[in-house]
Amino acid sequence: MTATYIALEGPDGVGKSTVAEELKEILLHRPDPTPYARVRIRHFPTRTLAQCAKEDGRALTAEDYLLDMENWLAFRPSPVEYPDTPTHAVRPDTLYILDRWVLSTAVYASLRGERIPYRSVPTLGWLGRIPLTTFVLMPKTPEALTDPDYPDPDGYDPEAVTEAYLRFLANAIVSSCFSRFIPIVVDREKDTPRSIAQTIAERMEAL
């Protein structure tokens, strides 16, 4: 059994989780046969990590997030295969939609002024190669975003977060790895989770 991965990234409140659910429905119920027998969604950080941090009363670090992803992959029964690794003529059995992955880890670490430990850099690079591609949902009007995890109106700055994502995407262009990241502009006045998911599904057909 093999698996393929795609990631959904973007600022808090842009709608990643809702879009992931819609995308799963589209891929499983499209008229033409989907190449995947199963489509699954995995949210990061995992509930286990979030609960442990809450019980310990501590904030999660970039290293915590990376270990969380690495541990999840380690306990999966399917082998992890890089998208650019030649394989036999066997179609992937399962598609995993990753709700957040390494891009968010790097973005939020930068916003916290946190340096990713040198020992974690190889893990960051390895995990970054797992998804076939990463769809980055970018809000057209970031100032309208809200996050239920930040009840204090001063606790979440969506414009600063969006700017951080834009900087990382710009760096991806410079480093010639932009093909790994596909920006999707989200216009809250016109777009719906379904229409965004449909756009992603169409982009996936071309991959």
Protein language model annotation of sequence segments:
Residues 11:
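P-loop (Walker A) phosphate-binding loop of NTP-binding proteins
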Residues 150-207:
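NTP-dependent small-molecule kinase module
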Residues 21-78:
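Conserved substrate/cofactor phosphate-moiety recognition/catalytic segment
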Residues 60-128:
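Glycine-rich phosphate-binding loop used to anchor ATP phosphates in small-molecule kinases
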Residues 8:
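Hydrophobic anchor at the beta1->P-loop junction of P-loop NTPases
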Residues 14:
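ATP-binding Walker
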Residues 108-173:
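A glycine- and Lys/Arg-enriched "phosphate-lid" helix/loop adjacent to the NTP-binding pocket
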Residues 17:
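Walker A/P-loop
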